[in-house]
């Protein structure tokens, strides 16, 4: 029997680098908030997914009002974001039962496709913990003292979201105390001793972080 699917969309960031009144996840691109573009990719999957959006209390009324006005997303869960991404995801897991599959995705990664999401869920069903990653293509340098030294980019990968897990694995992993090294869910799971798997990501599955990224989103969405 296949596990029920959940998507935890992390949208609690303040977006200070955007120089905008609204956090970046709420900025309109092609007539819709960036967050809506992201959520729609999950809603377009063939297999239904329960939507959980983690956001700051400050913007919950804004989002609820937008959904009502736009007749969008009648059913969703809206936990409160925490002090860090780790704590935000931990809050969301209170709404996910054991025996499910849970994808954790950045609310400002709108370029995933339903087909790509489906593949990640299917892989996680088999292995328990999976994330997409892409090789680095730019030359990289490591900061060293007052200067920099070249680094071998073939030794590194850029890890993306969504990262998909058996819910009981992710819940147990999030029972650990917070560590500053926990920059994504895969790191939390690996630190807890669970095996992980990386699969080929999408080069264009970028995280919208800067005004320049926003210009890219405007061109592609």
Q: Can you name each region flagged by the protein language model?
A:
Residues 18, 42, 63-64, 120, ...:
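Hydrophobic packing residues within well-ordered alpha-helices of enzyme cores
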Residues 2-61:
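N-terminal glycine-rich phosphate-binding loop and ensuing alpha1 helix
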Residues 36-99:
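Conserved N-terminal catalytic core of the sugar/cofactor nucleotidyltransferase
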Residues 49-51, 129, 195:
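Residues at the starts of beta-strands that form the adenosine-phosphate
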Residues 149-159:
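A recurrent flexible, glycine/aromatic-enriched loop bordering the glycosyltransferase active site
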């Amino acid at each position: 029997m296949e596990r029920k699917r959940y998507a935890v969309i992390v949208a609690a960031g303040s977006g200070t680098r955007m120089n905008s009144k609204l956090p970046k996840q709420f900025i309109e691109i092609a007539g819709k908030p960036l967050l809506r573009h992201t959520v729609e990719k999950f809603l377009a999957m063939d297999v239904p997914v329960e939507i959980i959006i983690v956001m700051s209390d400050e913007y919950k009324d804004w989002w609820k009002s937008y959904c009502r006005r736009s007749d969008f997303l009648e059913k969703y869960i809206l936990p409160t974001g925490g002090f860090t991404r780790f704590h935000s995801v931990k809050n969301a897991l209170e709404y996910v039962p054991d025996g499910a599959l849970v994808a954790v995705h950045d609310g400002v990664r709108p370029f995933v496709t339903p087909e790509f999401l489906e593949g990640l869920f299917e892989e996680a069903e088999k292995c328990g913990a999976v994330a997409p990653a892409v090789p680095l293509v730019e030359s990289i340098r490591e900061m060293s003292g007052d200067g920099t030294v070249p680094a071998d980019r073939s030794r590194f990968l850029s890890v993306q979201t969504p990262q998909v897990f058996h819910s009981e694995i992710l819940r147990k992993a999030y029972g650990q105390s917070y560590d500053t090294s926990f920059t994504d869910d895969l790191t939390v799971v690996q630190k807890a001793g669970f095996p992980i798997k990386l699969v080929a990501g999408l080069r264009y599955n970028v995280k919208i972080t800067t005004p320049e990224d926003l210009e890219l989103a405007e061109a592609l969405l």
